[in-house]
Amino acid sequence: MTFPIEKVRADFPVLTREVNGLPLAYLDSAASAQKPNQVIDAEAEFYRHGYAAVHRGIHTLSAQATEKMENVRKQASLFINARSAEELVFVRGTTEGINLVANSWGPENVRAGDNIIISEMEHHANIVPWQMLCARTGAELRVIPLNTDGTLQLDTLPSLFDERTRLLAIAHVSNVLGTENPLPEMIALAHQYGAKVLVDGAQAVMHHAVDVQALDCDFYVFSGHKLYGPTGIGVLYVREELLQDMPPWEGGGSMIATVSLTEGTTWTKAPWRFEAGTPNTGGIIGLGAAIEYVCALGLAEISEYEQNLMHYALEQLADVPELTLYGPANRLGVIAFNLGKHHAYDVGSFLDNYGIAVRTGHHCAMPLMTYYNVPAMCRASIAMYNTHEEVDRLATGLKRIHRLLG
């Protein structure tokens, strides 16, 4: 079946606008994806006619809002095939989800002399929390090195793991290189050593189906705003037996069972004890609409369309003089590049003049920039609403910039 690209594009109102007098070509979805009408309308309808504080309310609006919120928890659990909706914690995004694990599970399980393994391709959100945990506990942070093609040096893994390895924290897909890591093999190896595995799924869930049970990971986290949903909402999956033993890392309303000035405080059960304060209910409802939207299109169909477009893009960009591409031939979602010796900021500014939105900078992956010995890269994203014509405009724009700047 042909992917309904025109119908999809019609659902995203921003795609009708112009930038610098030209149609917008939005190639920055890996930073944050645009939102379809279905998501915008679902959140707006909630605020117009259904808003109330959730939990403990006896009135109709509160009960209905609570039901809607918890239904999205169930919906999200099915989306990633968790065993139970109660294995999912609503968080502000991937960054908060990783920090939750580092600050709740981490101090209970990581000691001086232990080690945590990450990779050289990680986003800062999957580096800095572990650096902070290691600094507090005296644990060692070990790093899986990169190959020049943007894949990991998997042959180094046996030398990195040992009986003191407590956690492997790894990107499902690199936000810069588009590398999809071989998670089943990596997770199986980690478990052989008794280590837990956290997967940063921020760049994966919008491109193909994710099954946390099949992966056998212990933690999986993703953001709503990259999945065509609202900002300020994400999901942390934690294997049930781990979640039940984790203490809360934030205190406040909603996460308590009892509070006494003389007897102290007891916590409510998971996952709610990790959701202190008033939740982003509107964002949660918008996330549910985003999940419903991509599932209605079909993740297999989205994946096929995007992969075909990615292959086309790589073919077109191969004809751009002095263009350096970073990452493996088989990649998901992103194309990182530099043009000659020109700074990524300059190239991105020229592309913006042509109505083309790309991301420039270090992409919250400074160690990766250090590995490639560059201060920055340009990054074009391939999403389900992008077209062959937009790819052509990118290639043509880069050729034009090369002619202008030499």
Swiss-Prot record:
Keyword Cytoplasm carried by entry: yes
Functional pathway: Cofactor biosynthesis; iron-sulfur cluster biosynthesis
Subunit details: Homodimer. Interacts with SufE and the SufBCD complex composed of SufB, SufC and SufD. The interaction with SufE is required to mediate the direct transfer of the sulfur atom from the S-sulfanylcysteine.
Keywords assigned: Cytoplasm, Lyase, Pyridoxal phosphate, Transferase
Chief location: cytoplasm
Co-factor requirement: pyridoxal 5'-phosphate
Presence of the UniProt keyword Lyase in the record: yes
Coiled-coil ranges per UniProt: none
Pfam families: Aminotran_5 (PF00266)
EC number: 2.8.1.7, 4.4.1.16
GO terms of molecular function: cysteine desulfurase activity; pyridoxal phosphate binding; selenocysteine lyase activity
Subcellular location: Cytoplasm
Stretch forming the signal peptide: none
Protein's recorded name: Cysteine desulfurase
